A protein has these predicted regions:
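Alpha-helical subdomain
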Residues: 1-76, 170-171, 175-344
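Conserved Class I S-adenosyl-L-methionine-dependent methyltransferase catalytic core
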Residues: 2-5, 11-41, 52-174
Length: 344
């Protein structure tokens, strides 16, 4: 029985794990070469046509096209390659849910840091920035990397915001405070979903400027405002809101700092107000799901935080006095659920 069981085992799953970077780098190279935007709205390309357009040899052009087709990013019709539906929807510049910014950030910022994951595990220190020179990942001296980061967050957040807005009813709470709201992606999408909603993005001054630009581009300046501030340094959060949103924020920080943020949320909310914590939630058994567990490792190379469980968030909220605690699950790239609490 033991021998037969051993023979049934296969290293193929390990091969898939070990070569996972092949998949990502194929996607990243195609994005770097702007392949999907080039193909959008066309009858497709041949290997020779792509080689000519990119001024490269036909051999690598054919190999890239074959790889992207195998991954479901392209479809081959006769000898011509066209975008698959998922590539056309999410990897073409200018599309509403363009995801390419996140791919670029992974390639330029996170891929090198993940190459030092073993070091991060041994030292319990981030590897995408130098903790001896910076107080956090947001203090980067390289404006280009910061721009890449925030564009990536906008890509990741836009579709996630729509999933959140469809999973949680905001129709009876017209005033939203988005704490650490980044480029205002959540606010833009939620205001599009809820015509009566108004929102305020509370962010660091340099990020608030990015948010203001995105809001103006979206034509929502009458419904979304930006307020510059620091949720650690400032003594209090702005008040007068029905709902406070913490979207992909708390996983950046250790427990004591998360509790400090939530304490300020409690103080800012009126009776009946809600706090919504949207994250890739690790399950209470701490066995997955994979996206949340791996995002937690990503927090190791990026931050002092980790991805927490619903039980942990509920405990912190309960300690502050929040009631009607519940977890709502949904499917999106940046979050798989939200923990909600109401101030009595």
């Amino acid at each position: 029985m033991t021998v037969n069981a051993d023979r049934a085992l296969s290293p193929v799953p390990l091969m898939q794990l070990a070569t996972g970077f092949w998949v990502f780098k194929t996607l990243a190279a195609a994005h770097e070469l702007d392949l999907f935007s080039r193909l959008s709205g066309t009858t497709g390309t041949t290997a020779g046509g792509l080689a000519e357009a990119l001024a490269i040899e036909e051999r690598p052009a054919e190999m890239l096209l074959t790889g992207c087709t195998a991954l479901g990013l392209l479809v081959k019709n006769d000898d011509r390659y066209v975008n698959s539906p998922i590539a056309e929807e999410f990897l073409v510049r200018g599309k509403p849910y363009y995801f390419g910014g996140f791919v670029q950030m992974l390639d330029q910022r996170l891929y090198p840091g993940w190459g030092r994951l073993g070091e991060a595990i041994r030292t319990n220190r981030p590897t995408t920035w130098d903790p001896d020179r910076q107080s956090s990942m947001f203090d980067s001296e390289d404006p280009r990397l910061l721009a890449v980061f925030w564009e990536a967050m906008h890509s990741l957040s836009t579709f996630t915001a729509r999933a959140l807005g469809q999973a949680i009813d905001l129709s009876g709470a017209p005033r939203l405070l988005d704490v650490g709201g980044g480029s205002a992606a959540f606010d833009i999408e939620l205001c599009r979903l809820y015509p009566d909603l108004t929102a305020t993005v509370f962010e660091l001054p340099n990020v608030a400027d990015i948010a203001a630009r995105k809001v103006k581009e979206a034509g929502l300046t009458k419904r979304i405002e930006t307020v510059a501030g620091d949720f650690f340094a400032d003594s209090a959060l702005p008040g007068g809101y029905d709902t406070i949103l913490l979207s992909m924020i708390l996983h950046d920080w250790a427990e004591d700092r998360c509790r400090a943020i939530l304490q300020k949320c409690w103080a800012a909310l009126p009776s009946g107000g809600r706090v919504i914590i949207a994250e890739l939630l690790v399950n209470d058994a701490r066995t997955g799901p994979p996206a949340a567990a791996l995002m937690s490792l990503n927090m190791l190379v990026e931050t002092e935080g980790r991805n927490y469980t619903p039980a942990e968030y509920r405990a912190w909220l309960r300690d502050l006095g929040f009631q009607d605690l519940r977890t709502v699950w949904f499917e999106a790239a940046g979050a798989n659920g939200a923990v909600i609490g109401r101030k009595p």
